[in-house]
Amino acid sequence: MLRRLSKNQPEEFKFTKVNLNWAKAQINKYPKGRQASAVIPLLWKAQEQEGWVSKPAIEFVAEFLDMPEVRVLEVATFYFMFHLNPVGSKAHFQVCGTTPCMLRGSEDLINVCKARISKKQHSLSTD
């Protein structure tokens, strides 16, 4: 499944003071020259802070870790745990779409979600 960044992006992203200190502590856990290994924890913290991973957050993490932005984008788009679009604040549903899950009936579950929540996948309901 191709994953793209949301068309609607915030102007900027910065870690809060607490999260910035946390990020620095994470980077210090890695040997010199291996700070890029902290990309997943930093993306996770960015998502925790704003509810999803925005393009400005990806740019911020890339600059913070002194790594190419495209490498951070690759990580963010590869792992489904990173939400590239805003998600609901009350509930967020994800249904496995792999072949084994489909064989066990995940398509039926997706259809129930479409009928009860939103006809369009990857969208927010009005409530």
Model feature map: region roles:
Residues 1-127:
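Signature of N-terminal electron-transfer/Fe-S-associated modules in redox systems
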